[in-house]
Regions:
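Short helix/loop capping segments that flank catalytic or ligand/cofactor-binding pockets
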Residues: 166-170, 229-232, 239-242, 300-301, ...
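Hard-cation-handling environments
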Residues: 303-305
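Short solvent-exposed loop/turn micro-motifs enriched in small/polar/acidic residues
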Residues: 214, 283, 296-299, 387, ...
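Short C-terminal domain-edge/linker segments immediately following a structured domain
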Residues: 57-61, 189-192, 321-323, 336-337, ...
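A hydrophobic, small-residue-rich beta->alpha segment in the mid-to-C-terminal subdomain
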Residues: 321, 388-392, 397-474
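Dual-mode signal for accessory low-complexity, basic/Gly-rich regions
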Residues: 298-299, 314-405, 438-440, 474-486, ...
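Active-site bordering "gate/hinge" segments
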Residues: 1-285, 289, 294-295, 308, ...
Length: 523
């Protein structure tokens, strides 16, 4: 219960359950296999604050039995953590938002049957279960909206592990009730020190990290796995970036993602800052290489994504993920079409540098050992590590997440464009840099400011941040990073080349040792 009590008072980050006030009713939506003990603890902790929590399981909303969900999950769980091609799903679903994903996947099947079969293996189950699976997401969405209509006193909704702007759309006319993600499906985040990390300290860490961006004329990012990119910034780009960079727990540390949207308010989350207005999307000409062995969905053999003046020019390595990435570079329209609100053609522009800000998150070992159905893009996989402070997750795309018409909503022009050409109107092809160094040069001074060094947020050592943290206890303990990725040849003894050829096996072994209690890092 102490951890649950801390969780329901946390006001910062992805899961700000503490934004609910006494007398409120909130809705928490969890997957069918969420830990019921954890959910009961959260509901009881809320009740102590005089907040009524409606905890709804997705399958109950959709009218599907637990047994059917277990059978579907077993049939569809055909992938391991090392099957990096799972990340290709994001091009078509969720973040990529292709209007007709089946037609897009068929384009791959016709050109590369082996890649198609490796990425979308056929599940073996009855026609009845297949029908349930195919209609499950829509059934949950419809039932969720009805539940909110039938329970008008609910003022706040928490659900999903990420993609907050897209998750809120699932609520339809109730979208403004969406207040955050929900990562307490099991005990991992709840048993960490994330819930008790002081919310005002968390926000100060974030504002310290972004305060120099408006004055930057160049950014440079490197990483020991091989990333090295740079981009020059005009004053106009820097100003727009600074206006749109903020989102609790997920900073938009590349100007392209910070624009093409109505920015979040720094003080009234999750409200949008209407005073800043719609920020027209920008394309920034970054040049260099992004190298990785991890993505949102899985791990992959070391991959290099080469950039020239903002565009992807070449993909090297990466196993099946790299093979699929190279194939998709020729997807119809992605080189020659010009997306709505953009001034240059093409889809394959660097878009995202999502940056985590809490030093108490850690990589969940269970993700490395649990098979997850490929359609469940935001359940498990390899998502938890992107929440570790200092980790950057990159993605590409020509995305205007919102339109200028209505705050927080995509433009009908973007939606119609996507339907007309069956191209993604979002972002895709995530890559994680686990130990990046991120610097910006201050305009007119020649001085560089380091925002992240070898995966450590510089703001965690800032005197003002430490002074504020001292109000809650020992600042060394409060601000200490609890998890550093153990990468052979970089942070622990071993050969990186061997790791880079098959990182999935390394991470499975790492997780297995933790599960058995034999890990040298758990003494």
């Amino acid at each position: 219960m102490p951890a649950a009590r801390a969780a329901v008072t946390q006001t910062a980050g992805r899961v700000p359950l503490g934004l609910a006030n006494g007398g409120d009713e909130v809705l928490i939506v969890v997957p069918w296999d969420a830990d019921r003990v954890v959910q009961e603890a959260i509901a009881r902790a809320y009740a102590e604050r005089r907040v009524k929590a409606h905890v709804q399981y997705e399958h109950d909303l959709a009218g599907v039995s637990n047994a059917d969900m277990a059978a579907i999950s077993k049939a569809e769980s055909l992938m391991q953590i090392g099957d990096g091609q799972q990340e290709l799903n994001f091009f078509f679903e969720l973040t990529g938002q292709v209007a007709n994903p089946e037609a897009g996947r068929e384009w791959i099947r016709q050109r590369d049957p082996d890649l198609f079969n490796a990425t979308w293996p056929k599940a073996r189950y009855s026609a009845q279960l297949e029908k349930i699976s195919n209609g499950y997401a829509k059934a949950v969405e419809k039932a969720l909206q009805k539940y909110l209509t039938d329970n008008p006193r609910i003022s706040k909704v928490y659900m999903g592990l990420g993609a907050r702007n897209k998750t809120r759309r699932i609520l339809g006319d109730h979208a403004d009730k969406f207040f955050g993600s929900y990562t307490y499906n099991n005990h991992f985040d709840l048993s960490s020190k994330v819930p008790e990390f002081p919310g005002d300290v968390w926000r100060l860490v974030e504002t310290k990290t972004i305060e120099a961006l408006a004055f930057a004329d160049r950014l440079e990012v490197s990483d020991p796995e091989g990333t090295a990119i740079a981009a020059d910034l005009t004053p106009e780009v820097a100003q727009a970036w600074a206006k749109g960079v903020y989102q609790q727990g997920h900073l938009y540390m590349f100007p392209s993602q910070a624009t093409g949207r109505w920015p979040y308010s720094l003080i009234r989350y999750p409200a949008y800052d209407n005073d800043k207005g719609f920020l027209a999307p920008l394309l920034v000409e970054a040049t260099g290489v992004i190298a990785s062995t991890n993505s949102h969905r899985a791990t992959h053999p070391r991959l290099e994504m080469h950039l020239d003046k903002g565009r992807v020019t070449k993909v090297v390595g990466g196993g099946w993920y790299g093979e699929g990435f190279r194939r998709l570079l020729d997807y119809p329209g992605t080189k020659d079409l010009t997306w709505p609100f953009f001034d240059r053609p093409g889809y394959w522009w660097l878009y995202e540098a999502g940056t985590a800000t809490n030093p108490k998150y850690f990589k969940h070992p269970a993700e490395m050992l649990t098979q997850v159905p490929p359609r469940e893009l935001l359940r498990g996989g390899n998502l938890s590590e992107r929440n570790v402070a200092g980790v950057i997750h990159w993605a590409v795309g020509t995305e205007a997440e919102h339109g200028p018409e209505v705050a927080g909503k995509p433009s009908p022009k973007s939606i119609d464009f996507g339907k007309k050409y069956n191209v993604p109107i979002g972002h895709a092809m995530h890559q994680h840099n686990l130990l990046p160094t991120y610097q910006v040069r201050i305009r007119g001074t020649g001085q560089w400011q380091t925002l992240i060094e070898h995966g450590n947020l510089a703001a965690l050592s800032d005197p003002e941040v430490r002074a504020l943290a001292a109000r809650y206890g020992d600042p060394d303990e409060i601000l200490r990073k609890d998890f550093v990725h153990p990468i052979p040849g970089i942070t622990i003894p071993g050969k990186y080349d061997s790791y880079g050829m098959n990182p999935g096996e390394w991470w499975k072994r790492w997780a297995g040792e933790i599960a058995r209690g034999t890990s040298p890092y758990m003494k």
